[in-house]
Each structure stands twice: as structure tokens, then as C-alpha cells.
Amino acid sequence: MREGYQGTGPGAITPDGCAVELYSRLPAGAEPDIVAAASPEGARILELGSGVGRMTHPLLERGFDVTAVDESAEMLEHVRGARTVRSPIEELDLGESFDVVMLASFLVHSGDIEVRRGLLRTCARHVARGGCVLIQREGEDYHTNLPRERVDPSGFTVRIVSSQPVGDGVNSVRAEYEFPDAVWTQTFRARPLTVEQFEEALEEAGLGVDRYLTDDGTWVRAVPVKEG
């Protein structure tokens, strides 16, 4: 387990505290629709941090060609119908390019700045000329007004219990997922980013914001920035 990361509950737990069975139960929600609307029809998509395929499978059903990348073999075992690659995202170099590179699950908020830089470099390295990078970022109130909870229509409760500063601009976040038959918890490190800080991080990797895709600013379409 990585320092500052922990997970509890039934089944396998990944190094960043994610429970494989939990993620196999979580619905995809509106996220595949957001990605599909921002992507060319039938696009080749590189999904970084695919997990069990929560978004992979709906995107495949919409006619996209998805390559799913995750560092967890246990997660990738659940992916069906897509090419899978087991690798830490920040170390990935496939030697090919994609119409769309997707970095979801708030991964851009990694508590480790060097990891974040590696994630964004991987995005920039794999996006085709004329392509785009779709990034999911935290909402403005993600670390405030806690605890808060949401009851999903499918019958489980997700609760953000706390977000405590641990130094250097990083917070330790604790989340709980309560189902009728099981409970999972996850503790992880996250670095809140203002819009300005987020856009600066993209610029450092040679990317720039094309537009924000959702009213709350949590989904972003970025594109390679031409040099010179």
C-alpha cells in the first residue's frame, strides 16, 4: 500500500486503496455520455486508470475503440472487449497515439506533484495531432462542507467523511461506501487545485484547456499546445 493510502472491506485492495469489488458495483453514471459527446465518432480512446471497466464498457457499447490501462491486474481482469495494458500510468509509453486520451477519477489531483507531472506527460505523449485529452477534476466544494453523503438511486450511500490537511498543500481524504450487504472505506491523498493551478499544470505538460465540458467545471477538454 502506498504511504497515505488505505482501503478496507471485502475482496482485493489495490495499492491506492481501491477495492476491486466495490468498483465493480459502482454505476458509470453520466460520465460515458460526457466523454462520448466530446469525442469523434468511433474514436480510438486511451483510458488511463480504467479500473474494472466502469466507463470502458459503456464506451465500447457506443462504438469506441478503447485501450484500458491500469496498474492493477485484479482490476483489469474485469475488463471485457477492450485491449488492456497493465502499467503505472506515469510510466506508460506505448509508442502510438490516440484520438482521445482520458484521465478520469480525479487522478490529476495526485498528492505527489511528480506523479501528477508523470500522468500529464503520459497524456501529452499519447494524444494524436488534432486529438484531445479529457480530464476529470475536483469540484470547487470537494474538500469543504464535510461530512456529506449521497444516496445513489441503485441503493448505496457514498459518504465523504473528512479531508484533513497533511502538509505541502495535500489533504488526506476518507470516503465510505455503504451497501446493504457490505461497507468499504478508502483513504487517499489529494492536492486541491484552483483553476489557475490546474491550467498551469496542463501548460507544463504542453497541454492547454480547449473548453470546460460541464457547468461545474469538473470535465475538461484539453489539447496539445503548438510550440513556436
Question: Residues of each region from the PLM?
Answer:
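A short acidic, Gly/Pro-enriched loop at the edge of an enzyme's catalytic core
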Residues: D93-V101
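A short glycine-rich, Lys/Arg-flanked "PGG" loop and its adjoining helix->strand segment in the class I
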Residues: R117-R129
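Residues lining the SAM
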Residues: A104-S105
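Conserved class I S-adenosyl-L-methionine
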Residues: M1-G51
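Class I SAM-dependent methyltransferase SAM/SAH-binding core
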Residues: V52-E91
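C-terminal lobe and adjacent flexible extensions of AdoMet/dcAdoMet transferase-like proteins
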Residues: A201-G228
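SAM-dependent methyltransferase
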Residues: L134-Q197
